[in-house]
């Protein structure tokens, strides 16, 4: 999943952190473009590429249905 953005990189990463935590994932150390988190066997990642005005949302885990449910929640919680 992706969506267009117009915000600066630090703001996008801050929103990514809030979305990951508010979806119930434990955050990990961010990189210059990504924020990730774990929740059991599931991993969430949000990648901000502000210079190209885009943010990507990725979810992985053992159940495709559950991963999609988490992905929808993550996407909805990103401002």
For the regions a language model picked out, list residue spans one by one.
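Flexible, solvent-exposed short loops/turns enriched in glycine
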Residues: 38-39, 49-51
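C-terminal basic regulatory modules in eukaryotic proteins
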Residues: 50-79
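Terminal, regulation- and interaction-focused segments at domain boundaries
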Residues: 1-23
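Glutamate identity and glutamate-enriched acidic tracts
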Residues: 7, 27-29, 51, 66
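Short, surface-exposed beta-strand/loop micro-motifs that present aromatic residues
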Residues: 44-48
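A cross-family detector of function-defining hotspots
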Residues: 18, 23-43
């Amino acid at each position: 999943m992706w969506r267009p953005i117009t915000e600066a990189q630090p703001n996008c990463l801050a929103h990514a952190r809030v979305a990951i935590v508010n979806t119930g994932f434990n955050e990990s150390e961010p990189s210059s473009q990504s924020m990730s988190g774990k929740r059991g066997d599931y991993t969430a990642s949000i990648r901000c590429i502000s210079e190209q005005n885009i943010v990507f949302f990725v979810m992985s885990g053992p159940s495709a249905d559950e991963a999609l449910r988490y992905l929808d929640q993550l996407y909805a919680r990103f401002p």
